[in-house]
Amino acid sequence: MKVVIVSSLAIRGTRLGGLDNNARLSGPLTICEMVRELGGEATTIDYFDKWDINILAESLCKWFGDEKNIVIGTSGSVNDGNTILFARLCRIIKETHPQLKVMLGGYRVITGNADWVDISFIGRCRNLVKEWLTGNDISKYQISDNPPSFRNPHNIIKEEPVSPIMHHSDFATSEELITIELSLGCKFNCAFCGFDYRNNKRAVVNTVEKVVSSCQTAYDLFGMTNFFIADDTINEVNSKLEVLAEVSKQLSFTPEFMAFARMDIMGAKPEQIDLMQQANLKTIFFGIESLNPAVTKDIRKGGKPERNYDIMRMIKRDFPEAFTYGNFIIGLEGDNEKGMWEHMNNLVDEQLLTSAGCNALRIYTDLDNWENMSDIDRDPAKFGYTITDKKEFAGQYGYDASHWSNSWTDYTYAKQLSNSVDQFLAKGLPSSYTAHEHFSIKTLMPGMSHDEYSAILPIINNKATMLQSTYIKKKIDWLNA
């Protein structure tokens, strides 16, 4: 058996322009690791959108050789924008290798059709992929015939957190990142959240040994030291941070991590600052959403504004080395424009965060996969929103967002207001980049100030392009060896 998993992250649209990708996705790495454990051969194709499609097809055909059991897959969990290009690649390969099986993985909605897709997995299905590859019956998990599509039961954790072991054929560098997970499951149930495993009181936590092995292998092979933590909430309990601190202690190098955290929990558990410092978790994404108590109660997140201000002051004072990014949702019922601007001005006046940004509330009312619908998506009226007939494409997942109105605004004006607030925060706080953007950039070009990073985006992208080109050349040589 030979398996290839193709993946690519979209260019990130920062407030200063497009930022090219320097991250490797953990899903493809983990699937390939699993195939090798099953006795097969496997490899990833990263930066798929940067390849010449004909050269890639020719190289893969050479690598497949005369193997009868061959599979090609793509990961749509983060970016499904290359599905059409992937379909073209598959058709080219099938001209000489008609036995090729095509797999779509991680998509949030059913994608493709049976004329070119053999099997599709919706959401997290690593356990089902393994069963399928080994020839076991997974029919009880099937949800569609066109293409044959499968998914795990809703909110039941059937697999373990991902901490991929990289392979020498990944041809990574110290200027790139990989993603790992400390746990699966988040005990919170925010009204706007549609993530897998939310409202789950029994998180599955990774072991120190597995995370150490993942990070240490990446360092030993490629010198990688920076890692995204993909957990929905890294600090919901102290034990997750204790695991990360122990991982950092056991590694032969000094790692650095970026993660999502809840600010209000840090306020309730100030000892978490020390744990984050021990772990070298210094880039933090706070989903603050709103500082209006009339909003935070309804969305089940946050608290009184003065308490939140005190928490930000504490983090700024006791954790000055941290890059803190706060994200806000514009248009939530219960908010108002005057109060919102007062809070934004307070953030800038006191420089309470390193960076902050916002986006207009999006409501998805007709997803094929209802499990990815938040409570607001499922019952907008209950939360004060009236849905109109108008829709618009919203983002790289292929979703259509519904236009809405509430007691103080509507989707159209919320987008306009969001743009104004976003630019105000970008200009008024030290950095114009989000936590993800900053972490990617400092991995690619470490040691610069926020002003310097803001001024050299074209240079950053040039370096990323050179990195990708070098990877592609090495991968072509390896596939054709």
Tell where the protein language model's regions lie, with residue ranges.
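A general structural detector for well-ordered alpha-helical segments in enzyme core domains, enriched
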Residues: I31, L56-S59, N82-I93, V211-S214, ...
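Conserved strand-turn element in the central/C-terminal portion of the radical SAM core barrel
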Residues: K50-D52, R262-D264, E289-K297, M312-G339, ...
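Catalytic cores of alpha/beta
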Residues: N113-D115, E333-D349
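Acidic, low-complexity intrinsically disordered segments
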Residues: K2-Q216, L221-G223
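Radical SAM [4Fe-4S] cluster-binding motif and immediate context
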Residues: A23, I157-F323, I330
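Hydrophobic/aromatic residues located in beta-strands of well-ordered beta-sheets
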Residues: V3, I72, V102, F227, ...
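Short beta-strand/loop segments at the ligand-binding rim of alpha/beta enzyme cores
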Residues: K94-L104, T254-F257, E321-T324
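Radical SAM enzyme core and accessory elements
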Residues: K2-I5, R36-E41, A57-I70, I92-Q99, ...
